[in-house]
Amino acid sequence: MAEVEKVREKEVEKEVERKEIEREEDVEVCPECGSPRLIRDYRRGEFICQDCGLVIEDTYIDAGPEWRAFDSEQRDKRSRVGAPVTYTIHDKGLSTIIDWSNKDYYGKAISVRNRAQLFRLRKWQRRIRISNATERNLAFALSELDRMASALGLPKSVRETAAVIYRKAVEKNLIRGRSIEGVVAAALYAACRQAGVPRTLDEIATYSRVDRKEIGRTYRFITRELGLKLMPTSPADYIPRFCAALGLSGEVQKKAIEIIKKAEERELTSGRGPTGVAAAALYVASILLGERRTQREVAEVAGVTEVTIRNRYKELAEKLGIEIIL
């Protein structure tokens, strides 16, 4: 009887888990504010509304592999199943490899006589996978892209978009005369803006091997040549990330976004850096809701100076009629 009950409990747990997954997949808008701007934070395992900051799901289980790989060869070697097509690998993940286990299909050990031949086959198979200059370029560039995206904590969708942008740049021969690292960084910056999870040029440059000036110049070039239509970044897009870094509540996040929307309606954000406006709005919101953070703390997270925050928050308070008691 005890065994039957255990089996039944496991079945109930599986059913509950299945329903939870179905419920999450059915969520298309925020149940709190009705916004469709939902984003999954893989680093913290959360499903979040970008507008009001509601955490819709905070126990997201990563369905990916339990192992880590630092290049495509290592990834292929450790994988136990066929992967889906992806633009983040130079051959889109369609090629195969000869395993190093030295065993045949039935699990029997390969004879000593045939191992030397198998070694040569592996060597040539690796060479065939990257057979020309374009493939070598893609292999290096996409591994660099993966490294930077991991360091920045970007989701898979942004990596795929950045890989597609880079591939288009290669097809149109826009790489000539420019460093691969610079074009990769520019493609990643464009993908972040396109996906609504912006990173500043300074943040991209921190993890890139090129400076901020080159990334900006290359970004303007590829967006013009590829005809990418990218809307200006809204300060509100930075709020969820800054809020999380400062340990502020969802109420503060909601209030900061509300302040930014009012500022945009009155055109107070025109000609001003979005990170500076976002930092100032967050600083004001934290004071209004009793979760005060210092200007230095906010400045460090936002990557701006304390002077910028002081100028922006005074401007917002004056033009929007917000009374701040310091």
Curated annotation (Swiss-Prot):
Pfam families: TFIIB, Zn_Ribbon_TF
Binding site for Zn(2+): C30, C33, C49, C52
Keywords: Metal-binding, Repeat, Transcription, Transcription regulation, Zinc, Zinc-finger
GO cellular component, one term: transcription preinitiation complex
Record SUPFAM superfamilies: Cyclin-like, Zinc beta-ribbon
Start and stop residues of the Sequence repeats: 143-226, 237-318
Zn finger (TFIIB-type) start-end: 26-57
Keyword Transferase annotated: no
InterPro entries, per database record: Cyclin-like_dom, Cyclin-like_sf, TFIIB, TFIIB_arc, TFIIB_CS, TFIIB_cyclin, Znf_TFIIB
GO molecular function ontology, one term from the record: TBP-class protein binding
GO biological process: transcription preinitiation complex assembly
Domain of life where this protein originates: Archaea
Purpose: Stabilizes TBP binding to an archaeal box-A promoter. Also responsible for recruiting RNA polymerase II to the pre-initiation complex (DNA-TBP-TFIIB).
Alphabetized HAMAP family for the sequence: TF2B_arch (MF_00383)
Family according to the record: Belongs to the TFIIB family.
NCBIfam families: PRK00423.1 (NF001658)
Protein name: Transcription initiation factor IIB
Species of origin: Archaeoglobus fulgidus (strain ATCC 49558 / DSM 4304 / JCM 9628 / NBRC 100126 / VC-16)
